[in-house]
């Protein structure tokens, strides 16, 4: 609602130079004046009977316009764009003044330079007044308003004829003109209030017609200033109630430029904050240390990385074959070529003698108590050679402890789940350790700004361990 910038208190004194339009600044209303009485008083009956405007052509010197009426006129004029619009005004008559309490638009045909009220417009006017009386609104019609989009507030020849006709039959009558385009450009309501003189009346302070027709449409230039001696302008005073003040504070566009600047500054500030947060996150990632994790968690992460490496390699190479080697020391320990003490130590650390050796998955259950497993030893796996009649190892019947140089699809796929010979309590402990570790890794990942990818890989790692996937 940019056309409603401010409602203001502007007094225009009589002078030799005719001032036909006013730019109203709207929140500067005279706070000391008692305008609340305008809502409760009725028209002055003594003035209505005496009709002093018949003997004094300039009896009415001021018009009071409510903030509601000004808003409605401005919005209506703005909605018409380059097309003229028209409406009626209702109000009251007091000494030397016309009070405009409310306005309503008329369904009329408008062009860029003219507006004509047809029969349906007059019918609408009568019905509106009847309905207003039924709801307790006793105001009568006190005038009409129309718009001049882009070419100022003044009365053309047709406007003068229309206003003179209405003043003869239903005086007091007022004409108001609003320029919505200038209102939008300057941020203040461009408005003028006028009354015409009687026929053959010569105003003593009438000004000569002006030749400045800038912005006036060609069809209106011949009328511009020609009829200026047939009407005069009234001072305009805006008034509002206490309740109107709160509403105007909401819809007022007094600081619309400031709001635009503020919105731009806010966007720039948000962008700067985002960039600063990115750099802070990078610094945090660079300085983050993993020494906060215990040995079990570090070992878990290493195994985690191995499985993730296999998955990514499979995706990149699009090949089911993956080659793996182990060190000679691991070969000796698994093939029995190393010393027995090494084998015994290996068995003690992994508790292989206490479990059924039908498979050997990636073991994370022992790493919570042992030292961190090396990357080399963590890739040792067993191959299932059941049914091999030539196997001489009675203690490990059906298995061949040899380093894997054979092709396989994935380490995780070759590691079958062990048939745990341990108690249910140990299995629960293993599960709890895994869940706790995954939770710690997830929290740690969030601390250093990682995405949900690591949580997903952790879940896949857990499935690989317990399901042998």
UniProtKB/Swiss-Prot annotation:
GO terms for cellular component: COP9 signalosome; cytoplasm. CDD domains: MPN_RPN11_CSN5. Residues 63-200 form the MPN domain. The keyword DNA damage does not apply. Its EC number is 3.4.-.-. Keywords: Cytoplasm, Hydrolase, Metal-binding, Metalloprotease, Nucleus, Protease, Signalosome, Zinc. GO terms for biological process: proteolysis. Transmembrane segments: none annotated. It is found in: Cytoplasm; Nucleus. Residues 201-220, 331-404 are annotated as: Disordered. Zn(2+) binds at residues 146, 148, 159. Catalytic Component of the COP9 signalosome (CSN) complex that acts as an regulator of the ubiquitin (Ubl) conjugation pathway by mediating the deneddylation of the cullin subunit of SCF-type E3 ubiquitin-protein ligase complexes. The CSN complex is involved in the regulation of the mating pheromone response. This is COP9 signalosome complex subunit 5. The lineage of its organism: Eukaryota, Fungi, Dikarya, Ascomycota, Saccharomycotina.
């Amino acid at each position: 609602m940019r056309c409603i910038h401010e409602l203001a208190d502007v007094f225009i004194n009589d002078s030799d130079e005719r001032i036909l339009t006013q730019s109203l600044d709207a929140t500067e209303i005279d706070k000391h004046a008692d305008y609340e009485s305008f809502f409760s008083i009725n028209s002055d009956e003594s003035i209505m009977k005496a009709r002093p405007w018949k003997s004094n052509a300039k009896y009415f010197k001021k018009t009071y316009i409510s903030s509601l009426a000004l808003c409605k006129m401005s919005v209506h004029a703005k909605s018409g764009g380059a097309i003229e619009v028209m409406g009626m005004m209702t109000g009251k008559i007091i000494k030397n003044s016309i009070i405009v309490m409310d306005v309503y638009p008329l369904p009329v045909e408008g062009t860029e330079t003219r507006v004509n009220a047809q029969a349906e417009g007059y019918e609408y006017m009568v019905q509106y007044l009847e309905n207003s009386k039924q709801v307790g609104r006793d105001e009568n019609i006190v005038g009409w308003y129309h718009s001049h989009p882009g070419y100022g507030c003044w009365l053309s020849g047709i406007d003068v004829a229309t206003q003179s006709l209405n003043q003869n039959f239903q005086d007091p009558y007022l004409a108001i003109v609003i320029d919505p385009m200038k209102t939008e450009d300057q941020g203040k309501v461009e408005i003028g209030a006028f009354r015409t003189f009687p026929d053959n009346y010569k105003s003593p302070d009438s000004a000569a017609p002006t030749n400045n027709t800038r912005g006036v449409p060609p069809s209106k230039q011949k009328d511009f200033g020609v009829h200026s001696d047939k009407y005069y302008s009234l001072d305009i005073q805006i008034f509002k109630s206490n309740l109107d003040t709160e509403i105007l504070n909401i819809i007022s566009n007094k600081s619309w430029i400031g709001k635009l600047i503020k919105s731009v500054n806010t966007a720039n500030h948000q962008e700067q904050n985002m960039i600063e947060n990115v750099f802070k996150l990078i610094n945090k990632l660079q300085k983050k240390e993993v020494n906060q994790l215990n040995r079990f968690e570090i070992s878990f992460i290493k195994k985690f990385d191995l499985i993730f490496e296999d998955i990514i390699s499979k995706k990149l190479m699009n090949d089911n074959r993956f080659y793996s080697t182990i060190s000679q020391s691991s070969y000796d320990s698994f093939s029995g070529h190393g010393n027995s003490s090494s084998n015994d130590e290996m068995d003690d650390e992994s508790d292989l003698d206490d479990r059924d050796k039908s498979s050997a998955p990636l073991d994370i259950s022992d790493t919570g108590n042992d030292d961190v497993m090396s990357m080399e030893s963590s890739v040792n796996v067993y191959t299932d050679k059941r049914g091999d009649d030539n196997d001489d190892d009675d203690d490990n019947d059906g298995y061949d402890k040899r380093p894997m140089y054979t092709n396989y699809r994935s380490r995780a796929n070759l590691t079958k789940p062990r048939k745990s010979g341990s108690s249910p309590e140990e299995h629960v402990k293993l599960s709890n350790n895994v869940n706790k570790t995954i939770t710690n890794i997830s929290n740690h990942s969030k601390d250093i700004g990682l995405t949900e990818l690591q949580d997903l890989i952790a879940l896949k790692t857990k499935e690989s361990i317990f399901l042998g996937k």
